């Protein structure tokens, strides 16, 4: 196996790790609360990334990237994790996460709008299909049903709003990274910043004192932190040394992989209409990717 293929496989591992996050974060938050659970997870993830990357290159990171990148990164992670933590149940957590997975499509649309990215006609169905897919998912057992979709959103508007806002923020983060990062990686520092914010939120919340009193809870907390910390490290390695085109294409299947792993972790039976909607989200994102594939790409930051 060549070094490039090995690096690509390492990048693939990040996709699997990130896909497990919805299930593991939900389990931890069910036991520790939304604020306390995510604070524990991101603190542990920060330690893992510090062990991998350290902070020795911080002085070389552009200050504008540190500020805007850190602000957007922390905001996204807050929206993503809390949208799962605030969900009423496991099924809703999985449905909410599908809104978050609009970010690949939004990233490409933002690149077209703000980065002069060129695209062909496939961008039109590529932009429309994920919206239809999300509507299909939120329609529940009845599939594409606007009234049921609105009823589901009204049942817990905060979670759905956080997930959608998070997808917008991550697409913006990708644009900021391309313009300001100068090839530097500030993720370890950003995770520390995120963890601090989450502990502050927990301190001002009404959640009870943390009680981690079972091995399974420790295990799921570690798995979530491992998925975040090692996931970022593996992805960066894959992007730098592997086949970026293959990794970018594979990343668009995260919604399907995430839903599958979440259904196992949370013991859920997801309906046929849910899988149809999720498939449309992935297919639309793939069309957006294909619409720009033969053009000079301005996209260098792809995520979970």
Annotate the PLM regions.
Residues 1-39, 145-179, 200, 261, ...:
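Glycine-/small-residue-enriched transmembrane alpha-helix faces in small-molecule transporters
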Residues 6-10, 35-51, 67-68, 125-132, ...:
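Hydrophobic alpha-helical transmembrane segments of multi-pass integral membrane proteins
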Residues 16, 20-27, 31, 45-61, ...:
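Membrane-interface helix-cap regions at the ends of transmembrane helices
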Residues 17-24, 56-94, 99-100, 136, ...:
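Specific transmembrane alpha-helical segments of multi-pass solute transporters/efflux pumps
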Residues 28, 37, 83, 113-115, ...:
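Hydrophobic/aromatic residues within transmembrane alpha-helices
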Residues 36-47, 85-116, 244-263:
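Specific alpha-helical transmembrane segments that line the substrate/conduction pathway
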Residues 49, 68-73, 119-142, 252, ...:
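Hydrophobic transmembrane alpha-helices of multi-pass small-molecule transport proteins
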Residues 54-64, 112-122, 175-186, 239-240:
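Membrane-interface helix-boundary motifs at transmembrane edges
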